[in-house]
Curated annotation (Swiss-Prot):
Keywords: ATP-binding, Folate biosynthesis, Ligase, Magnesium, Metal-binding, Nucleotide-binding, One-carbon metabolism. GO terms for biological process: folic acid biosynthetic process; one-carbon metabolic process; tetrahydrofolate biosynthetic process. It is an enzyme of class 6 (ligase). NCBIfam families: folC, PRK10846.1. ATP binds at G53, K54, G55, T56, N252, R284, D297. GO terms for molecular function: ATP binding; dihydrofolate synthase activity; metal ion binding; tetrahydrofolylpolyglutamate synthase activity. This is Dihydrofolate synthase/folylpolyglutamate synthase. It comes from Buchnera aphidicola subsp. Schizaphis graminum (strain Sg). The gene is folC. Its EC number is 6.3.2.12, 6.3.2.17. Its cofactor is Mg(2+). Monomer. Mg(2+) 2 binds at H167. Binds 2 Mg(2+) ions per subunit.
């Protein structure tokens, strides 16, 4: 069948078959983007990289900019349920028809060039943005930075939220190596906002080499939690007090604020507090049901698990905590579990619907948990939990975007059984 007749779901299946090869440079990708006129868009670009917190930082940045009256495009990854989640224009998702049109354009222009899934959809996102008069475009880095598809764009301001150990097979096994890869998004003479206090030396080295201006937390800008329900943000040009506590990590809200103020863009300070309090991102310590409380979190590495552990400590519960846990085989499985082992009473370990999943046999060998049950899929674990759960208990679904996504696909029709 000719691709002009492809439905949206057919395009999804087609794209999922694309190569996953490692790229040595971005030359071919830039060539396609140049032909499409995507390298000279007049928008102000933010490129947001880092190990964790990219999505929430982007979501907060988008909200702050929209409420300041800007026309904003947002590109994030991965999606939880539907591909359309990845691309928003002025806070709204685009139609399947829009995406299909863009896919046809990119597919025709790439010719015989072999692209990865992420490279193809990044070009598609940029093409869609080019169809609008956008003041600002926010790009979330997919993986690393230096060789990431988003790095074909020379951003006006780059962000590194933090640097942890993840994706070691392609980024390196230590923070210095990973920091070097993530700093690949830096640009000469441009500002890069750094959201972590103890960054590896490689970040400073790349910044010096590229003549990038670093704006570091606790050096150039600051934030402090003052009360349980308020915090302060201090920047060289502005001081904000008694800000509301956001529903995303405060550290990422602060990074978004720093990025916005260092961009030089005008900010609507009157709407700032309202903007901060409204942002919520699916799968980020998201409560989807109460009594019993069900929390979804995409935490999948040690750095994210540490934050999740802190959030669990804030919960006042008389019941037990059950974990529905599925994780990919290339992650630090033992490290993630070790962080949360003492916080969780019962582990319901699952196999995920992806060939990247850590198998049940692998997890049984890797984990020394006396309080764990193992299941072939999320649905089986869910049926088992429902037989023992009480209204005072907590169910924590975490370990991967896949884990949360698979749970979200069954939760709506199952919650009524409580």
């Amino acid at each position: 069948m000719h691709k002009k007749k492809y439905t949206f779901s057919m395009w999804m299946k087609y794209l999922e078959k694309f190569d996953k090869k490692d790229r040595k440079n971005l030359f071919e990708l830039k060539l396609i983007a140049k032909k499409l006129g995507l390298l000279n868009l007049k928008s102000f670009f933010f490129t947001v990289g880092g190990t964790n917190g990219k999505g929430t930082t982007c979501a907060m940045l988008e909200k702050l900019l929209l409420d300041s009256g800007y026309q904003v495009g947002l590109y994030t990854s991965p999606h939880l349920i539907n591909y359309s989640e990845r691309i928003k224009v002025n806070g709204l998702y685009l139609s399947e028809k829009d995406h299909i049109f863009s896919f046809l354009i990119i597919d025709a222009e790439k010719g015989n060039v072999s692209l990865t899934y992420f490279e193809f959809i990044t070009l598609s996102a940029l093409f869609l943005f080019s169809q609008y008069s956008l003041d600002i475009i926010i790009l979330e880095v997919g993986l690393g930075g230096r060789l990431d598809a988003t790095n074909i764009i020379d951003s006006d301001l780059s962000v590194i939220t933090n640097i942890g150990i993840d994706h070691t097979s392609c980024l390196g096994t230590d923070r210095i190596s990973i920091g070097r890869e993530k700093s690949g998004i830096f640009r000469k003479g441009k500002i890069a906002v750094i959201g972590e206090k103890n960054i590896p030396i490689s970040v400073d080295e790349i910044a010096k080499e590229k003549k990038t201006i670093l704006k570091k937390i606790d050096v150039d800008w600051f934030w402090t939690r003052t009360k349980i329900d308020s915090w302060n943000f201090i920047h060289s040009n502005i001081e904000l007090y008694n800000l509301p506590v956001s529903r995303i990590p405060l550290s990422n809200t602060a990074i978004a604020l720093a990025s916005l103020f260092y961009s030089g863009l005008e900010v609507n300070l009157k709407k700032l507090k309202s903007s901060i309090s409204k942002v919520q991102l699916s799968g980020r310590f998201q409560t989807v049901f109460n009594s019993p409380r069900i929390i979804l979190d995409v935490a999948h590495n040690v750095h994210a698990a540490l934050y999740l552990s802190e959030k669990i400590d804030e919960i006042d519960t008389e019941g037990q905590i059950y974990a529905v846990f599925g994780i990919l085989k290339d992650k630090d499985v033992a490290g993630v579990v070790q962080v949360l082992q003492k916080k969780i009473n019962y582990w319901y370990v699952v196999n995920l619907k992806t060939n990247r999943s850590a198998s049940i046999n692998y997890l049984k060998k890797k984990l020394s948990l006396n309080n764990a049950l193992f299941f072939n899929n999320i649905n089986e674990s869910w049926q088992a939990i429902k037989k023992v759960i009480t209204k005072k208990d907590i169910i924590l679904v975490f370990g991967s975007f896949f884990t949360v996504s698979e749970f979200m696909s069954i939760k709506d029709r199952r919650l009524t059984l409580y």
